[in-house]
Amino acid sequence: MKTVARALSGSARAMARKPMRFTDLRTVQLRPPIVPTHRNFEVSPDHPLWAFFPDGNNSQTCYREASDLDIQSRAWTTAELRRKSFEDLHQLWYLVLKERNVLAREVRLADAINERNTHVHDQVDEKLLLTQKRIKQVLLERQTAFERVQTFTQQQQEYLEEFRQRYLDADASQIASYNEKLIRLQYAFFGIQPQLEDYNWETDINERFVDGLNYVSHIKLARYFAQNPDVEEEIGYPLKGVVEELPFLLRDPSEAVEEVRALRQSGAQVKLDKIDVLPFLRSALQAALEQEGRM
């Protein structure tokens, strides 16, 4: 074992690098020293730190004098910001933030070189800060409005469900009154006009109208099924789109049920693509209005 250790130790000594020796140090050629200067460094033109300079990599100076700043500028008004989209506000926020960073760097540099004349920089920064505060105010207004809409939508759904239950529970002496209430409700909540001639076909027939048609048709159908349980087994629930729902808006529930039964027995296609729903409703309602005029 000792023999092996000696052999390894001898090999290690033999392979060890010998120190370098110069016979004559005067013959060694040294490179001239590099003078430290910014010209010795190449900075990428798209380096992120260029964002802290007013003109990016084209900036000619690292500090702008007061005369170089736009002192005639003003902050954005709240009214102007309210007309901007979320994308515009997002972009404007970061443009303002970038300019504030440039000003902050220049003020810090001025402190380092004992340049105290930075009050103009501070004035411009105050305008930018005011713009940021107003952007936050506009976003807060939109957030508050959104939350109120959400709350109203929830309250609306609760009211619609409550009315549906009262409509289904109404007895024969109350149903006429509830039908009148339903007419007022469908107009107030969904824009469904009491008379066909009151419609603006291009603006009134929309997604809101479709939602109202779904609500009105199913509430009438549910009451009809409650009074005629044998029909429920035959027709089934729910209705298949606006083609089957529209008769409940235009006619008595019993007549509407017969029309739905005839549609299904004929094998006609009643499920429409979404893009065809509004054109179908406009055409069908106009045809119903013309038929009323001939009667």
Swiss-Prot record:
Q: Where does the protein end up? A: Mitochondrion
> What does the UniProt keyword field contain?
Mitochondrion, Ribonucleoprotein, Ribosomal protein, Transit peptide
* GO BP: any one term: mitochondrial translation
Keyword Transcription regulation set for record = no
* GO CC list: mitochondrial large ribosomal subunit
What's the family? Belongs to the universal ribosomal protein uL29 family.
What interactions and quaternary structure are annotated?
Component of the mitochondrial large ribosomal subunit. Mature mitochondrial ribosomes consist of a small (37S) and a large (54S) subunit. The 37S subunit contains at least 33 different proteins and 1 molecule of RNA (15S). The 54S subunit contains at least 45 different proteins and 1 molecule of RNA (21S).
Q: What is this protein called?
A: Large ribosomal subunit protein uL29m
Gene it is expressed from: MRPL4
